[in-house]
């Protein structure tokens, strides 16, 4: 019912996360007001799930500069009420949908955090190590996902080649018209090179 995102990259810092500008201001109730902008957020906004939980790295006002002062925050798209039901919209908005080559099925967004309510996860100033613990698993997951997609593409191609008839080959004894395309040498070569 809910989905999640990882919000690291900002317009001012790509790989140098120590330069991030997103701020976290502690409130009297223990929550934080998160303000800043994140870019390249996969599935950053969509209406397929009831809520989106954003994991956001930000710097608390009294934290040191650089990567040693980064904390991790849970920032929901919608505030969750005490009874677990969905409450009002949080201060998270979509600035734009990214226009990157090859992205057609993913709402990769620019997200704006405007005094959004956030909840610190884990110890203060340890957010980067927490985020990268999760990201290390995600790197493996993305690789396995790519392997799965390529495997099903290959299997579907072989199935189709065994069902589709087109033209005649010289190495079959079929007399009833066209041959299955898997009998064609170039199709077999293409399948071997997939």
Regions found by a protein language model. Name each.
Residues 16-17, 27-28, 112, 140-194:
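Alpha-helical interface subdomain recognition
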Residues 18-25, 57, 111, 115:
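Short beta-strand elements
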Residues 3-5, 30-32, 53-55, 69-73, ...:
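Beta-sheet entry/capping signal
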Residues 1-32, 39-40, 184-194:
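Gly/Pro-rich turn-and-neighbor structural signature
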Residues 2-10, 71-72, 164-174:
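Core alpha/beta catalytic barrel or barrel-like domain that forms the active/cofactor pocket
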Residues 40-42, 79-95, 100, 107-138, ...:
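A glycine-rich, basic-preceded beta-loop-alpha segment at the flavin cofactor/substrate interface
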Residues 31, 35-89:
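A short core secondary-structure module
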Residues 12-15, 45-47, 64, 100-106:
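Short Gly/Pro-enriched turn/cap motifs at secondary-structure boundaries
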């Amino acid at each position: 019912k809910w989905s999640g995102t990882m919000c690291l990259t900002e317009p001012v810092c790509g790989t140098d996360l120590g330069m991030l500008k997103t701020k976290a201001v502690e409130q009297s109730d223990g929550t934080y007001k998160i303000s800043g902008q994140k870019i390249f957020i996969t599935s950053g906004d969509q209406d397929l799930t009831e809520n989106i939980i954003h994991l956001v790295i930000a710097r608390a006002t009294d934290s040191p500069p650089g990567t040693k002062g980064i904390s991790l925050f849970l920032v929901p798209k919608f505030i969750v009420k005490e009874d677990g039901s969905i409450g009002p919209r949080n201060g998270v908005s979509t600035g734009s949908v990214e226009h990157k080559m090859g992205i057609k099925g993913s709402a990769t967004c620019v997200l704006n955090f405007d005094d959004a309510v956030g909840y610190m996860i884990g110890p203060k100033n340890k957010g980067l190590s927490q985020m990268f613990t999760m990201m290390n698993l995600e790197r493996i997951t993305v690789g396995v996902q790519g392997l799965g997609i390529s495997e099903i593409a290959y299997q579907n191609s072989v199935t189709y080649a065994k069902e589709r008839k087109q033209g005649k080959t010289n190495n079959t004894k079929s007399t009833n018209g066209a041959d299955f395309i898997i009998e064609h040498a170039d199709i077999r070569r293409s399948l071997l090179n997939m």
